[in-house]
Each structure stands twice: as structure tokens, then as C-alpha cells.
Amino acid sequence: MKPKKIISNKAQISLELALLLGALVVAASIVGFYYLKSVTRGTSTAESISKNITLAAKNKALDNIYKVKRALNGQ
């Protein structure tokens, strides 16, 4: 007499695929969260760097204007 199978092979394969799919969804969610977090952090960093570069360029331009004014006035 052969023992009866409680779960068929098809059901076990289906369960394993469902667990694998669930793990993939969880991993994709975690990766997506950290990607969005890094993008927002990068945006604020880029904005800060852009403001600093703009300020430095304005200061350099004003410095050059003052040098030209002094040169024209003979100082």
C-alpha cells in the first residue's frame, strides 16, 4: 500500500513560485524606497551646490567690475 500525498507537486511548485514572487516584490519595494530617498537627497544637494556656485560666480564678476573701475579711475 502506497502512502497518499498530502500536497501534490504542482501545488508545491505553485506555492514556491508565490513565495519567490512575494520576496521579489518586497525586495523591489525596499530598493525603490532607498532609490527615491537618494534621489530627493541628491536633489537638495545639487540645489545647494548650484546656489554656492552662482554666488561664487557673482562675487567674482563683481570683483572684476571693481578692478576695472579702479583701473579706469587710475587708482
UniProtKB/Swiss-Prot annotation:
Keyword annotations from UniProtKB, A to Z: Fimbrium, Secreted
Main localization category: secreted
Locus of motif QXSXEXXXL: 12-20
Places the protein is found: Secreted; Cell surface; Fimbrium
Cellular component aspect of the GO annotation: cell surface; extracellular region; membrane
UniProt key word Secreted: yes
InterPro entries reported in the protein's UniProt record: Class3_signal_pept_motif (IPR007166), ClassIII_w_PIP (IPR026451)
Propeptide: 1-11
Highest rank taxon of the organism: Archaea
Description of post-translational modifications: The N-terminus is cleaved by the prepilin peptidase EppA, which recognizes the class III signal sequence.
Domain notes per entry: Contains an amino terminal motif QXSXEXXXL, which is part of a class III signal sequence.
Protein name per the record: Probable pilin MJ1469
